[in-house]
């Protein structure tokens, strides 16, 4: 077993698939059956409401973590990294993510340089590896977002506020253990 694999198995180093998602109030919409030939009326609230989430999927445990943000940008990405470091108590992390422009921004790079303190790559606190360009199918966090939105759609009749939609979305993601097996390991 290599030193890197041993560090991952011993949980000294985490491998996290990271992504951002915009949850919209409309994501909770479902279908309803009604009498044939009659229009069914349902009360509507603001369909424009949305919440941005950053998420991280631990590839070893299958556990996902969500973090709400006002939007997806460089500042929020740095804040998310800080939240990850607090949550995972400063353990080393390999971040697998897409090539969004703010992932490559000067602000994010400056934060990574500060955290990694110019050390050898094998000792970096946070190491970022990009998925192939325009290949969201490589990132299992995309499937986690879909599972959360699907769960919300299945309970749409019980969700009367956007706050309830957000709570249901996050609760489903954080209580589920995701198993992607081959999808994760085809990347390596």
Regions found by a protein language model. Name each.
Residues 76-94:
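Short, basic/hydrophobic alpha-helical segments
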Residues 91-104, 131-134, 139:
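Acidic/histidine-rich, metal-coordinating catalytic segments
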Residues 39-47, 115-140, 157:
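RNase H-like polynucleotidyl transferase catalytic core
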Residues 20-24, 58-61, 100-103, 134-136, ...:
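Short, solvent-exposed loop/turn segments at secondary-structure junctions
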Residues 26-28, 105-109:
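A short acidic (Asp/Glu
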Residues 12-13, 91, 124-127:
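Short glycine-/polar-rich loops that comprise or flank the Walker A/P-loop
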Residues 1-82:
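Extended, low-complexity cationic-aromatic segments
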Residues 11-15, 138-188:
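C-terminal anion-handling pockets and recognition modules
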């Amino acid at each position: 077993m290599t030193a890197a694999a041993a560090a991952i198995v011993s949980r000294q180093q985490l491998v996290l698939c990271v992504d951002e998602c915009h949850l919209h109030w409309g994501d909770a919409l479902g279908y309803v059956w009604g009498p044939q030939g009659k229009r069914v009326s349902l009360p509507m609230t603001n369909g424009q409401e949305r919440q941005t989430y950053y998420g991280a999927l631990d590839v070893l445990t299958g556990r996902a973590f969500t973090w709400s943000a006002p939007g997806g940008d460089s500042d929020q990405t740095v804040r998310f990294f800080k939240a990850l470091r607090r949550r995972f108590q400063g353990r080393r992390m390999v971040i697998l993510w897409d090539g969004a422009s703010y992932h490559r921004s000067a602000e994010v790079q400056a934060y990574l340089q500060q955290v990694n303190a110019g050390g050898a790559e094998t000792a970096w606190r946070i190491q970022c590896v990009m998925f192939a360009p325009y290949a969201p199918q490589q990132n299992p966090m995309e499937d986690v977002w879909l599972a959360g939105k699907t769960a919300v759609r299945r309970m749409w009749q019980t969700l009367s506020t956007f706050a309830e939609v957000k709570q249901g979305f996050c609760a489903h993601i954080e209580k589920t253990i995701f198993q992607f097996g081959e999808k994760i390991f085809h990347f390596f």
